[in-house]
Amino acid sequence: MAQIKITLTKSPIGRKPEQRKTVVALGLGKLNSSVVKEDNPAILGMVNAISHLVTVEEVK
């Protein structure tokens, strides 16, 4: 399966609690932190919920 790199580009401060929990669940902490995750529907749904806070790149 393909992998994606998720980078936190905006702060979750002042956002809804569900969005902050999603950021933590993805393993993102400080700004500009990145994680590499498998490209599956569960992860893509989480990324879609906080798409205004993160950038996503495909990893080869």
From Swiss-Prot:
Which SUPFAM superfamilies does the record associate with it? Ribosomal protein L30p/L7e
Instruction: Give me the Gene Ontology terms describing cellular component.
Output: cytosolic large ribosomal subunit
**Ribonucleoprotein listed as a keyword:** yes
Q: Which gene encodes it?
A: rpmD
Q: What top-level branch of life does the organism fall under?
A: Bacteria
Give the coiled coil ranges: none
What Pfam families does UniProt report for this protein, alphabetically?
Answer: Ribosomal_L30
Name assigned to this protein: Large ribosomal subunit protein uL30
**This protein's UniProt keywords:** Ribonucleoprotein, Ribosomal protein
A single Gene Ontology MF term assigned here is: structural constituent of ribosome
Cross-referenced Gene3D superfamilies, in alphabetical order?
Ribosomal protein L30, ferredoxin-like fold domain
Can you cite a GO biological process for this protein?
Answer: translation
Q: How does it assemble?
A: Part of the 50S ribosomal subunit.
The entry's family comment says: Belongs to the universal ribosomal protein uL30 family.
